[in-house]
Amino acid sequence: VERLAGGERTATAAAVATRARELGLAGPPLLVSAERFPDGLAAGVLAGAVLRAPLLSTRRDELSPPVYPWLASYGTGALTVVGGPVAVSPRVRCQIVTGFQYSFLCP
């Protein structure tokens, strides 16, 4: 058993995503709201079982500090944001646009 943790939920997600990369999950990461768990639950299945991709989380109105450095270090140049603008705001989407190809999975 290996314990993966961070100082708060977005840091924990980044720690798990880092370990996933180390274990060979090489698909483009998915980004979900750290504040709305249903998106994360649904995306977890897609990320792990289908895409073999890491799952990151962020605050709705501000890109969480662990996310951008993770993307800069481990990202594939692509990112999928799961959820609509209520889950991940347009402001956060604008923060991640530079340097990444991205897509949105919205209801």
Describe the function of each predicted region.
Residues V1-P107:
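Extracellular glycan-binding segments that recognize GlcNAc-based cell-wall polysaccharides
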